[in-house]
Amino acid sequence: MNKKEQLYEGKAKKVFATDNPDLVIQEFKDDATAFNNKKKGTIADKGVVNNAISCKLFTLLEQHGIRTHLVEKLSEREMLCRHLDIIKAEVVVRNIAAGSLVRRYGFAEGTVLECPIVELYLKDDDLDDPLMIEAHAVALGVGTFEELAHLKQQAEVINTVLRSFFAERKLKLVDFKLEFGRHNGEILLGDEISPDTCRFWDLATNEKLDKDRFRFDLGSVEEAYSEVERRVLEL
């Protein structure tokens, strides 16, 4: 599969065309950003780690009936993916109170939620990715009510699978972000699943093992990412 012109560059990844218009190559970068690009830096080998974790988790989800954009892992930093028309919604699933949920509603950080909360955010950096209800999303042309219900249903299934997987590896899946896209009339899970897009806490100590270590200058960022990779791939 030949890597051709760059189609897109985001905060953490580049996307390249291939010989097949239905397939793209997603390349993971070491760049790190937080607070909608207001804080920038690099995390050594983050791209390698996130690609490995994402490929493993997409494969796991496929085994549980969740269709994803992953075709195969190509190299340390690259995966071959189905070319998606990305839906302009970020789907966030929350199991434990942290981050913006604490700031908005006054939860104590670490509060275990009665049931998982599934939220929709408009994917728009200029607007700081605002929280939206389904009616907003439909009015903005993000998707239909039926499509949004499907996204939430998929997110709930993904949460069930991933919580169990990470619990076996002594990690709490605090919350995580998902992105979906359309491919030949089907909605597929896209983007990545990694310490960039999830909050992971150690089950015994609640040590943060994700991008919060970069966001809040907690140190040992590379070590945290590598520890998640070790637990995902080796256990």
From Swiss-Prot:
One of its GO terms (molecular function) is ATP binding. It comes from the Bacteria. GO terms for biological process: 'de novo' IMP biosynthetic process; cobalamin biosynthetic process. InterPro entries: SAICAR_synt/ADE2_N, SAICAR_synt_PurC, SAICAR_synth, SAICAR_synthetase, SAICAR_synthetase_CS. CDD domains: SAICAR_synt_PurC. Coiled coil: none annotated. Keywords: ATP-binding, Ligase, Nucleotide-binding, Purine biosynthesis. Pathway: Purine metabolism; IMP biosynthesis via de novo pathway; 5-amino-1-(5-phospho-D-ribosyl)imidazole-4-carboxamide from 5-amino-1-(5-phospho-D-ribosyl)imidazole-4-carboxylate: step 1/2. It is an enzyme of class 6 (ligase). The keyword Glycoprotein does not apply. It catalyses: 5-amino-1-(5-phospho-D-ribosyl)imidazole-4-carboxylate + L-aspartate + ATP = (2S)-2-[5-amino-1-(5-phospho-beta-D-ribosyl)imidazole-4-carboxamido]succinate + ADP + phosphate + 2 H(+). Gene3D superfamilies: ATP-grasp fold, B domain, Phosphorylase Kinase, domain 1. It holds the Pfam family SAICAR_synt. The keyword Nucleotide-binding applies. Its EC number is 6.3.2.6. Belongs to the SAICAR synthetase family. NCBIfam families: purC. This is Phosphoribosylaminoimidazole-succinocarboxamide synthase.
